[in-house]
């Protein structure tokens, strides 16, 4: 049996693969797309009722679930309710989670769902604290992800 952290890491890896499918110029095959969507969805469903043993593990779990549900196209009808439940858990965590990369990642994961400018502003405040040094790979990735979300708010855009 895998540890909760191993399952979280696995969900993150598969979600990342699904979200970046085809961005490398390789063709997207429908069977691989379906397989990744199914895998991400089932992993999210498996982990949905879980809770981290520590504040950090719970934050990592919420990030993984929000990312996974965001990545998959599957919705048997209760996906929005589950996303809202994870958002509620995340907002409770943000009340106690210290300023850190993990907090920034959770803020951005929540922002990706609701596009609340206060979440983005708080993430930017954390990022601004990194300006006087070279960014780690993870910091660079979260900066780029937030930038991409702010530039492409498709789910919150109205089509004329």
Question: What is each of the regions a protein language model found here?
Answer:
Residues 36-49, 75-94, 118-132, 158-160:
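Alpha-helical repeat scaffolds
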Residues 128-160:
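Acidic, proline/glycine-rich low-complexity IDRs
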């Amino acid at each position: 049996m895998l540890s909760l952290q191993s399952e979280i890491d696995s969900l993150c890896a598969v979600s990342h693969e699904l979200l970046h499918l085809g961005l490398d110029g390789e063709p997207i095959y429908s069977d691989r797309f379906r397989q990744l969507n199914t895998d991400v969805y089932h992993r999210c469903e498996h982990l949905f009722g879980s809770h981290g043993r520590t504040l950090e593990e719970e934050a990592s779990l919420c990030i993984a679930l929000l990312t996974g549900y965001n990545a998959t196209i599957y919705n048997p009808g209760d996906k929005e309710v589950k996303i809202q439940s994870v958002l509620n858990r995340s907002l409770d965590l943000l009340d106690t989670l210290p300023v850190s990369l993990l907090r920034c990642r959770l803020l951005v994961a929540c922002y990706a769902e609701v596009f609340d400018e206060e979440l983005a502003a708080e993430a930017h405040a954390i990022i601004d604290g990194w300006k006087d040094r070279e960014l780690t790979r993870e910091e660079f990735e979260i900066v780029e992800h937030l930038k991409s979300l702010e530039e492409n708010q498709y789910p919150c855009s109205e089509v004329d």
